[in-house]
């Protein structure tokens, strides 16, 4: 995966195998991109809340969600902040990106669409 292209558009319309959801570590998907994921993937949201309750979602730890339907997109949940009311920090983004680079091949990710990290509701 060495080709990076910047595109403007709706991440949910992406033709990529995997799409990235920017999340916090407290179990809230209340605005922006995360809210879009919560509405489209309610079963993932329920697991996310449970993982947060059990302190399994942390900065630098990525969670790949795959729906049982084979033709469905994969969602890479990427923590960009600890709490929804605090901004993202550059070191949080770097930790997540480093983990992505280290693990995308073993996870089977062949193509991916990222939203802008740490901006809008994240910034």
Please place each PLM-identified region on the residue numbering.
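Macrodomain-like recognition of ADP-ribose-binding/processing modules
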Residues: 1-123
């Amino acid at each position: 995966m060495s080709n990076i292209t910047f595109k403007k558009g709706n991440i949910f319309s992406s033709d990529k195998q995997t799409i990235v959801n920017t999340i916090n570590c407290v179990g809230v998907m209340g605005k922006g991109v995360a809210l879009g994921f919560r509405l489209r993937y309610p079963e993932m949201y329920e697991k996310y809340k449970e993982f947060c309750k059990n302190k399994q979602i942390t900065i630098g730890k990525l969670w790949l969600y795959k729906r049982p339907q084979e033709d469905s997109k994969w969602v890479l949940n990427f923590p960009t902040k600890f709490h929804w009311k605090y901004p993202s920090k550059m070191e949080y983004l770097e930790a997540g990106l480093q983990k992505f680079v280290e693990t995308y091949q073993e996870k089977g990710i062949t193509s991916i669409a990222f939203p802008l990290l740490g901006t809008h509701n994240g910034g």
